[in-house]
Design a protein with these regions (language model features):
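Alpha-helical transmembrane segments in multi-pass membrane proteins
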Residues: 1-90
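Transmembrane helix-loop-helix hairpins at the membrane interface
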Residues: 11-15, 122-237
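Hydrophobic membrane-targeting alpha-helices
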Residues: 18-23, 62-63, 67, 96, ...
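Short helix-terminus and kink motifs of transmembrane alpha helices
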Residues: 23-26, 103, 107, 153, ...
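Glutamate identity and glutamate-enriched acidic tracts
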Residues: 25, 39, 75, 116, ...
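Residue-identity detector for threonine
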Residues: 27, 35, 48, 95-98, ...
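Short helix-coil transition/hinge motifs at the ends and kinks of transmembrane helices
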Residues: 30-35, 111-112, 162-169
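Juxtamembrane helix-loop-helix connectors linking adjacent transmembrane helices
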Residues: 62-142, 160-164, 235-237
Length: 237
């Protein structure tokens, strides 16, 4: 149907714009020295997350549903429940362990983590103080909801609508690759890491049949990365 072609054009435009703009904005964030500038960045990314990923996904999925299109992903013929449970437990354990480390960290421990943050690709997005942590938590919540709706629920359905359900696996792979590619601003390591995260989220979605669970897992992972690790590095600052 023509609607899938139209949606794909919209999706490609959003992705192209996002790659170009995110890279520029992340460069600005990387150079930002004052917390006011960093907080403006968080607020802007929260807004753009809803505008470019959340809203189009919700509207698109509602339209397709009203048209009678099955917006769930087809069965892949493999029991993914054990894998989904395993990765979920690992993520939860890592988050708890990091939180415990943050509470027990010494001044030297925090300095070491700060040095690692400054060296790692994507480290600039980690909050530096309590004010930034609050905004980073909101950004994590927004990213978890909107990116999962866009890359796990909306994008694969549109691709399947164009190439057919027989090639559903290909559509799923393409959506995971695109999810990694939009994180170009984080460098090659960031692309590979987010690509792996995309695989994990897709496994959870396929195993549960509900977008709710990958959203929750995504939020937890992002909060660990931007908020809990920030607490580990900077304490109650």
């Amino acid at each position: 149907m023509y609607i899938f072609s139209l949606f794909l054009l919209v999706i490609l435009a959003i992705i192209g714009y996002g790659i170009a703009v995110d890279r520029k904005e992340y460069t600005v964030l990387d150079k930002a020295k004052d917390t006011a500038a960093r907080q403006r960045f968080y607020r802007k990314w929260v807004a753009t997350s809803w505008l470019f990923y959340g809203l189009p996904s919700i509207v698109g999925l509602l339209i397709l549903s009203k048209m009678g299109v099955d917006i769930s992903l087809p069965e892949v013929g493999v029991n993914l429940v054990p894998a989904a449970v395993s990765v979920s437990v690992i993520v939860l354990l890592l988050t708890v362990v990091t939180l415990v480390q943050a509470k027990r960290a010494s001044a030297n421990d925090r300095k070491k983590v700060q040095q690692e943050i400054n060296q790692v690709s994507g480290g600039s997005i980690i909050a530096r103080n309590s004010s930034e942590r609050r905004l980073a938590a909101v950004l994590s919540l927004s990213a978890g909801i909107n990116e999962e709706l866009f890359f796990r629920a909306f994008l694969p359905v549109v691709i399947i609508g164009l190439i057919g359900s027989d090639l559903a696996i290909l559509a799923i792979v393409i959506s995971v690759v695109i999810f990694g590619a939009v994180h170009l601003y984080q460098g090659l390591r960031g692309i590979m890491l987010t690509g792996i995260i995309g695989v994990v989220m897709m496994v959870v979605y396929l195993a549960t049949g509900s977008i709710f669970w990958p959203i929750i897992l995504h939020i937890i992972m992002d909060i660990r990365s931007t908020v809990v690790i920030s607490y580990l590095a900077y304490g109650n600052k």
